[in-house]
A protein has these predicted regions:
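Adenine-nucleotide phosphate-binding core of ATP-dependent small-molecule kinases
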Residues: 90, 151, 158-206, 213
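Active-site phosphate/pyrophosphate- and oxyanion-stabilizing loops and adjacent acidic/basic residues
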Residues: 27, 146, 221
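Glycine-rich phosphate-binding loops at beta-strand->alpha-helix junctions
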Residues: 177-180, 202-232, 236-238
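Conserved, well-folded catalytic cores of nucleic-acid-processing
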Residues: 32-36, 78-79, 100-103, 151-154, ...
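Active-site neighborhood for divalent-cation/phosphate handling
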Residues: 2-101, 206, 233-243
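Small-residue (GG/TT-enriched) beta-loop-alpha framework at ligand/catalytic clefts
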Residues: 54-161, 184
Length: 246
């Protein structure tokens, strides 16, 4: 998650090799990283920015605590997978957004990506294909599962399965799902207001829904009605080609 990461853009000599840059960054690490270097996982990349001094370049430094990376790698190992790359969430969103950008209506410049995960909801605002704002809230699909669990006397696992299979009593839509959807709208509206109050923007052009809870029935429609912006569910397969063998 972006909140667990430190990013810093620093100037360095253009003629340095990557090995030399790494040595220099590690020597100067205390300036940029507020925890011991042996507890850090860090990486860097030379940015394509053109500086006034052609002998200097901007270098993006990214660091997080090593335990943050190891915890996620261990989860993958339990699933029989091996992690090859650890990326920052906001950078991943920028890369993924390139897939959707061409599918949006003409004139759409400022897009809010509302990612509703299991425990966290993140609003990332895109402007010219770059993330210009991110806000995370501790709220997600887990709350809906817990409401199902409490309402119908199920275990958490049973509630999760019932939510996915939509095998719930007739009063579910009114008594449980409806209030949850309203809570999602409130969270989204609050995040947007924080964005507007901290920037020169007072509106966005479009909202893309993403995450494991993006396809909850009625969510996109309710967000569009309440917030006043067009809302669509992000579909990464919309422009993807398939092999004739599939």
């Amino acid at each position: 998650p972006t909140s667990m990461v430190i990013t810093k853009t620093i100037e360095m000599d253009a003629d340095m090799t990557d090995d030399e840059r790494e040595v220099q960054i590690r020597m100067d690490a205390e300036q940029y990283i507020p925890f011991p270097l042996d507890e850090a996982s860090l990486d860097f990349e030379v940015l394509p920015d053109r500086l006034a001094n052609p002998n200097r370049v901007n270098v993006l430094l990214v660091a997080t605590r090593l335990e943050n990376v190891e915890a996620r790698a261990e989860v993958l190992e339990l699933a029989g997978l091996t992690a090859k790359i650890a990326d920052v969430e906001s950078f991943s969103i920028e890369n993924a957004y390139q897939v959707f950008a061409d599918t949006l209506p003409m004139g759409v410049n400022t897009v809010g990506i509302l990612d509703i995960g299991h425990t966290m909801t993140t609003l990332s605002v895109m402007q010219k294909n770059k993330v210009i704002y991110t806000r995370e809230q501790v709220f997600g699909g887990k709350q809906l599962t817990q409401e199902i669990q409490n309402r119908y006397g199920l275990s958490f696992e049973e509630a999760g399965r019932a939510k996915k299979s939509r095998s719930l009593p007739d009063d579910y839509d009114v008594e449980v799902l409806g209030p949850y959807l309203e809570a999602v709208v409130q969270q989204a509206a609050r995040s947007l207001q924080f964005f507007f109050s901290s920037s020169q923007f007072n509106e966005i052009d479009h909202i893309l829904l993403a995450g494991g809870n993006a396809n909850i029935p009625g969510l996109a429609k309710l967000l569009q009605q309440k917030l006043g912006y067009r809302v669509t569910v992000a579909n990464p397969f919309l422009q993807m080609g398939f092999s004739p063998q599939i």
